[in-house]
Amino acid sequence: MTNAKKILISGVKPTGRPHIGNYFGAMKQFVDLQDEYDARIFIADYHAITTVQNAEQLSRHTIDMALDYLAIGIDPAKTLLFKQSDIPEVCELGWIFNCITTMPFLMRAHAYKDAEAKNKEINVGIFDYPILMAADILVQNADVVPVGQDQKQHVEYARDIAEKFNRTFGDTFKLPNALIYENVKTVVGTDGQKMSKSYGNTIPLFATDDEIQKAVMGIPTNSQGIAEPKDPDTDNIFAFHKLFADEKEISEIEKRYREGGLGYKESKDILIANMKRFIAPLREKREAFAKDEEMIRNILKENGKKARELAHQKMEEVRKAVGIA
Ligand code: AMP
């Protein structure tokens, strides 16, 4: 029987604790869409080596990331949850893509340009990141890739590379599309910039109550008094309310902002209470899964085998098309 569902693929790098930007921008969609799609979610450990260069840390982060996925509701009976490195074929495909991609094309990537502008030391892995990402996506024949806005260009790169391959070697790859939800495409951090570990403005998805309290209290505010009307559209605390309050409460808070009468202290207290209520059950689920790491390793191992089998079939086609079968 053929599977009529469209194929979804995405992944997150195991570089430490995921933050609420990763969750609302991408990971939540993995859970919400796992019934509708043939969902394949991976732990991007090859990608993580560009920054995590310590074996113990990388394997710890990898198991941690599997726990994170299970805790937010990824169901391994519905979603193929696997480790990227269980499919070494992606490196082979990445090499083939390297050979049909020009340097100037990769030099136009935002992530590369940002790193260069900050004078960061850029290893070849970081420069070549879009190629490996294209291989992750295309080897699985994916239709859609749920990601945050910052990864949109990389999915477009995967499309461009697929087109180039198809033109050069014959029709082999489907052209994937990024799936980005407008309201969460860029989740802001405590300082109002995009939430990102490199800006030090994150709130961890599995934050403790103390961490939540400290992070929210640290959100900078201006000197407007309680009675003064405030603009919710430019307020950092309100941006978080939109993620953690229900619709009724959001509109009540919005009204009080515009009319005046809601001070920043009270707004922060409401946010802290809502965040704690949202995060506590996730943290508890995570702790429960963490009691059986053997089970986690088995899930990854079994799913890794299945994902590799799917990739293997695609690679047979690719090798034939290229002339290395
Ligand atoms: P990474 O940790 O770079 O592998 O990112 C994992 C996923 O989270 C990607 O789909 C990103 O686009 C998404 N993401 C990261 N930061 C944010 C953010 N601040 N807002 C929305 N999505 C984000």
Stretches with model-predicted labels:
Residues 22, 153, 159-325:
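Conserved nucleotide- and phosphate/pyrophosphate-binding catalytic cores
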Residues 55, 145-148, 172, 227:
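Short, polar/flexible loop-turn hinges at active-site or ligand-entry regions and domain interfaces
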Residues 80-83, 146, 224:
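Short catalytic-loop micro-motif centered on adjacent basic/acidic residues
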Residues 111-165, 169:
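Internal, conserved structured core segments that host functional sites
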